[in-house]
Amino acid sequence: MSLKHFIQDALSSWMKQKGPESDIVLSSRIRLARNFEHIRFPTRYSNEEASSIIQQFEDQFSEQEIPGIGKFVLIRMNDAQPLEKRVLVEKHLISPNLTESPFGGCLLSENEEVSVMLNEEDHIRIQCLFPGFQLLEAMKAANQVDDWIEEKVDYAFNEQRGYLTSCPTNVGTGLRASVMMHLPALVLTRQINRIIPAINQLGLVVRGIYGEGSEAVGNIFQISNQITLGKSEQDIVEDLNSVAAQLIEQERSAREAIYQTSKIELEDRVYRSYGVLSNCRMIESKETAKCLSDVRLGIDLGIIKGLSSNILNELMILTQPGFLQQYSGGALRPNERDIRRAALIRERLHLEMNGKRQEDESI
């Protein structure tokens, strides 16, 4: 299993599954920050120390298997081309920060559900991604990977403070739990403007699709905990679970209200966006995200039939600049990317609809 295995498909195998509440919650993520006890933090360690971390993971964890999760393979960042690294970021397998780490690495499970980032902000960052609303399941998997690593690594841990991390905001549990949610109706009704400040007051933070500093394009929001100290892992996950459940309910109510009061306007918006995606000859990534959001809403409300939301998950990744260029075989100028993106969307939508039509005719 090589790097090519992880960059050739837009959809990770876990993304092809339908999780609970997947019309609103695209994915659930658990991330655990850990550090070696006897090695200085990445802000201060030497090149030799950084290299020793990668080497230990290559020797002791690469090509090893966890029951129920699968085999892992180690990818060194300095072995990957810039475009390949960008694709891994766009698939949410690694962070943008890791791509800039000269001694960075990533231990990836075959199904891409688990990634262990090495020499990022901390020595070790365990990430588990599950489809739909499955925070508790993701937490269970993260703990399993954490225990597996701890069998061979002594973690930096303090009885009073918990796990020690490079950034003080991660000290304690070292846990970041997050859900990625598609909230178009709350945006359309502008309820999101009062909901975000209320969420922030609960010790949670709302970000865009690629985390800190990113914009919520395509009405996709990432909601995560901010506090890691003074609360148990279970409390952190349960608090986020509770808020996400309320958001699901509010989004469903807003969708129902729009459908009941502005059905024609909503259908017009959905079909216009579908028309753009089906027929455009050039399209930028931001407009693509907006149109994909409208079409996804149309599918979820039964306005558009014969189109799977899975195709939209695929297009979300496939139309990002890195994947688009990787798919096209090399670097593209911005206008070339817009032309290629439009062609790719048309091809995939027409292929999907034709496949559905043939399926219906054969029944």
UniProtKB/Swiss-Prot annotation:
GO MF assignments: ATP binding; creatine kinase activity; kinase activity; protein kinase activity
Function (record text): Catalyzes the specific phosphorylation of arginine residues in a large number of proteins. Is part of the bacterial stress response system, where it is involved in regulating the global heat shock repressor CtsR; phosphorylates arginine residues in the winged helix-turn-helix domain of CtsR, thereby preventing its binding to DNA and consequently inducing the expression of repressed genes. The transcriptional repressor HrcA, the chaperone GroEL, the unfoldase ClpC, together with several ribosomal subunits, represent other physiological targets of McsB under stress conditions.
Transmembrane segments: none
Xref: PANTHER family: ARGININE KINASE 1-RELATED, ARGININE OR CREATINE KINASE
Keyword match Cytoplasm: yes
Motif annotated as RDXXRA motif of the pArg binding pocket involved in allosteric regulation, chain positions: 337-342
Record keywords: Allosteric enzyme, ATP-binding, Cytoplasm, Kinase, Nucleotide-binding, Phosphoprotein, Transferase
EC number, UniProt record: 2.7.14.1
Record's catalysed reaction(s): L-arginyl-[protein] + ATP = N(omega)-phospho-L-arginyl-[protein] + ADP + H(+)
Protein's UniProt name: Protein-arginine kinase
Residues noted as binding ATP in the record, renumbered to the chain: 27-31, 92, 125, 176-180, 207-212
Description of what induces expression: Is repressed by the transcriptional regulator CtsR. Forms part of an operon with ctsR, mcsA and clpC.
Subunit field text: Interacts with CtsR in its autophosphorylated form. Interacts with McsA in nonstressed as well as in heat-stressed cells, whereas strongly interacts with ClpC only in nonstressed cells.
CDD domains noted in UniProt: bacterial_phosphagen_kinase
Species: Bacillus subtilis (strain 168)
Boundaries of every Phosphagen kinase C-terminal domain copy: 24-254
Superkingdom of source: Bacteria
Cellular location(s): Cytoplasm
Keyword DNA damage: no
Major localisation: cytoplasm
PTM note: Autophosphorylated on Arg residues. Phosphorylation on Arg-40 and Arg-86 are up-regulated upon stress conditions.
Similarity annotation: Belongs to the ATP:guanido phosphotransferase family.
